Amino acid sequence: MEGYILSLDEGTTSARAIVFDREGNIKGIGQYEFPQYYPKPGWVEHNPMEIWDAQVRAIKTAIQKAKVEPAQIKAIGITNQRETTIVWDKNGNPLYNAIVWQCRRTAEMVEEIKREYGDLIKEKTGLIPDAYFSASKIRWLLDNVPRLREKAERGEVLFGTVDSFLIYKLTGEHVTDYSNASRTMLFNIKKLDWDEELLEIFKIPEGILPEVRESSEIYGYTRILGNEIPVSGDAGDQQAALFGQAGFETGMVKATYGTGNFILVNTGKTVRYSENLLTTIAWGLDGKVTYALEGSIFITGAAVQWLRDGIKIIKHASETEDLAEKLESNEGVYFVPAFVGLGAPYWDQFARGLIIGITRGTGREHLARATLEAIAYLTRDVIEEMEKLVGIKELRVDGGATANDFLMQFQADILNRRVVRPVVKETTALGAAYLAGLAVDYWESLEEIESLWRVEKIFEPRMDEETREKLYRGWKEAVKRAMGWAKVISS
């Protein structure tokens, strides 16, 4: 009987389940959305039980659509939105809503801690202190949910990121993997353990934390489909995408084009620090840890959504490609989509969106082109930062916006690097499936996985150097003018 791997891909707005075969082909997908809650400005929450219910429905739909028997599922892998923080009791019941990675409620707390301990935190965790990561969210819960700290001291509270919660609901085991642990701002990425000094700074009892394991091993067994199935793969979404892109060698880099862009480069067994990028754990496998540098760009695909829903100059995201191609060049129009500040490598929370260079002749095609170009410029900003530490030959891409050929060609041109789009676009779920399959010998080795990675299209750079650098200089100038704007208007 043919065997398959089930991958659970738990995102920020939906829970998905995908069944993969031995060649990495998709046999069936289930996907269900769940709501986000905004109790106060800047606060973002999920109901963990709504995530769980959506995930269970997605699993059942994927199995049904794949037309496979539960007994044919050889292992389950999990990948997840990272940093989102959940606390629950030993019966698996949540004790508060999940505090989502986007939530800014702890920004002031983190600013205070950063002033005193910023360098220490970066040295130990690889992260630039921010409300984005789990540590301050856990502290907020312990300080604000009635009796939670008291219960935690009695050993009645469990914390985890979403992967950890799902593994607990599936198997009863309280574990996470290295990649997810490295996003909590509590995990020492050199010692590979929870850091006592950081736990003290954030006033978090160690007893609530999950055991940290490799990204590919059997964590426990589940009977979600009736029969016993090992849960044996776990990685945060961006790390899973790098694994799914077979980015196993030092210097291999992937960019995921979603609401924002996330760019990860494999730095091998070495912990490398960059002033403007995050250092993170890519995965733990066969007793070895692989590290990565990460650049997070907050707004990319969301800028295209704004063209559609905000100023309503397009009906569908795909229209931007045709509009952009109506022009020979950007005609001096730049758009810096700093709607929520700028992420890597600028880290300016006071930057705001800017459109510059418009004239009476500027039309919607200019705005569409400037938006797509901005995504490519922002990606180059991060890759230039990475290249200071590690050589990069090509960019492997995934995510919704990679279907846009204009964007992919412009990306290759502005980077002066080959851009490679794979056949299977679901690289995040595929990465989790590979990790799960390796643990149960469904796949034998990284070499076998590498041989399954297939190219759909390669975009070679075609732009001359003078044009490329002139365009990029214009971009850098536009960014300068967008930076700090929120401070200017509030002073």
UniProtKB/Swiss-Prot annotation:
> EC number(s) per UniProt?
2.7.1.30
Q: Which keywords appear in this protein's UniProt record, sorted alphabetically?
A: ATP-binding, Glycerol metabolism, Kinase, Nucleotide-binding, Transferase
**UniProt cross-references to SUPFAM superfamilies, sorted A to Z:** Actin-like ATPase domain (SSF53067)
Q: Which residues bind sn-glycerol 3-phosphate?
A: T12, R82, E83, Y132, D237
Pathway membership, UniProt: Polyol metabolism; glycerol degradation via glycerol kinase pathway; sn-glycerol 3-phosphate from glycerol: step 1/1
CC per GO annotation: cytosol
Q: Which family does it belong to?
A: Belongs to the FGGY kinase family.
Q: HAMAP family in the record, alphabetically? A: Glycerol_kin
Write the protein's name: Glycerol kinase
Q: What is the lineage of its organism?
A: Archaea, Methanobacteriati, Methanobacteriota, Thermococci, Thermococcales
Q: Which gene encodes it?
A: glpK
